[in-house]
Amino acid sequence: MQESRFIQKKRVLVTGGAGFIGSLLCDRLLAAGHKVICLDNFFTGTRENIQPLLDNINFELIRHDITFPIFLEVDRVFNLACPASPIHYQYNPIKTLKTNILGTLNMLGLAKRVKARILHASTSEVYGDPHVHPQTEDYWGNVNPIGIRSCYDEGKRAAETLMMDYKREQNVDSKIIRIFNTYGPNMRADDGRVVSNFIVQALTGQDITIYGDGRQTRSFCYVDDLVDVMLRMMEKDNFCGPVNTGNPDEFTILELAEKVVAMTGSKSKLVFKPLPQDDPTQRRPDISLAKKELGWEPKVNLKAGLEKTIPYFENWLAHNTKEVKS
């Protein structure tokens, strides 16, 4: 991060601040001396994620759903609120759409009123099942608008449109990042994402569930690297994005499963199930723009990131064994 640009202390709003990425972003902002307001409705966020922050005098927690307006005085808005794993956003697709559209509208309205800079956390899902590889920001994507994932994919695309329209028409200082697969501490064990699934299954001796033949690819970014680029993007003047934020190292799902099994010493077997509808076959970011405009590229490779993530889940399982299905 351009630390010198962020020395002036600010009031920072983080929507979805009790979630996986949001909680770690709040922690980093507090460490830099900022006043942080964490907004979360606790649909997927957890109090456990922010428990260590509650005694900090610069931290304020507000239980609130951003589909309803809120009036606050802030300098910066990180808009992260939205369920981000298929198991959660498909559970309530209409709510997911409302969060992306009404929630983003409300945060843009707030940013306009108080003249705050706002950064929207979009997603690689705006590219759908891409025909271009790796994906660059000028690729418009290949999204099924009526599929079971569309509440998230199209919701995020609509939110990007709102961000750009408010910038063009209302002069709101808005920014967009497109987050690719991210993992690390504070992930939920039950969120259905591939890294958390594989680690929990391996640590508990369950079969490792691979959907499809395992040859589909993903790129995995460790969460500390993501928080770094979010902070850089927020403080970068005269650049609104969108910009890809992810690790360009590409792995097959089968390679990930084998790596997790080896690193945990698990005796779990690999089992294969049908690939879900609209599940992308390839996903890898081109981060040339992030390198050029933000001077950023990820530092943590997959092995090093897993070495930090596996102990988190070991500790979580030691205290939450009843919540894990056998």
Give the role of each language-model region.
Residues 1-6, 25, 64, 106, ...:
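C-terminal substrate-binding subdomain of Rossmann-fold SDR/epimerase-dehydratase oxidoreductases
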Residues 1-182, 224, 300, 308, ...:
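N-terminal Rossmann-like NAD(P)+-binding domain of SDR-like oxidoreductases, especially those catalyzing
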Residues 91-92, 186-191:
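Short, solvent-exposed loop/turn segments at secondary-structure boundaries
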Residues 97, 187-188, 219-222:
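Nucleotide-sugar-dependent glycosyltransferase donor-binding/catalytic pocket residues
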Residues 133, 189-197:
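A glycine/serine/threonine-rich, flexible loop-to-helix segment
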Residues 151, 159, 191, 253, ...:
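Conserved donor sugar-nucleotide recognition element shared by glycan-biosynthetic enzymes
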Residues 158, 162, 166, 198, ...:
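Hydrophobic alpha-helix immediately C-terminal to the catalytic Tyr-X-X-X-Lys motif of short-chain
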